[in-house]
Amino acid sequence: NSPAKFCPPPFSKVVEGLTDVHPRIWVQKSSWDKFIEQAKTKKEYQWYVKRAEKVMKVPMKGLNDINLEKLSSLENEMKRKAYITRESRRIIDAEESNGMVLVYAYLLTKNEAYAKEATKRIISMSDWNKSSSVAGDFNESTVVSLASMAYDSFYDLLTDDERKAL
């Protein structure tokens, strides 16, 4: 019992203390409805819901939408790489933002359509770094952050495969 020596409890004791429900980071399940009611009076609520509705109406842009038309006219590798980086970032940045909006809109409304669309988009984005159409800093940390936020927020809605993918 010396304060200088830490003796961790046995694993069985630690496991006993674990909750049997998924712990939430953004919104606790028990206070979610109250959170939604309080949020409805905020202008940000309307902004996120309106933006999410707009995102839902537009198909996700993908790697095939990256404009590479001018690539062949560039005379050196450095200019080509800068061009690919700039053009790929246009698509990537927009879709990262769209994914974030859908996650927030789901948390604000419990509309499962937002969660399903966000899940589909985020899983798709997670493979973009493997493409030759993407160059430069892909912001993988942003995608990981977005995926973990989606995992936490949609946990009860996700299939086992979706949980593994996120």
Where do the protein language model's features map onto the residues?
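Mature N-terminal, pre-catalytic/accessory segment of carbohydrate-active enzymes
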Residues: 1-49
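Short, flexible helical or helix-coil boundary motifs
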Residues: 6, 42-46, 55-63, 75-78
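Mature catalytic domains of secreted/periplasmic carbohydrate-active enzymes
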Residues: 29, 34, 66-68, 74
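Amphipathic alpha-helical interaction segments
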Residues: 34, 40, 55-56, 146
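Aromatic-lined, polymer-binding surfaces characteristic
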Residues: 48-49, 57, 63-71, 81-166
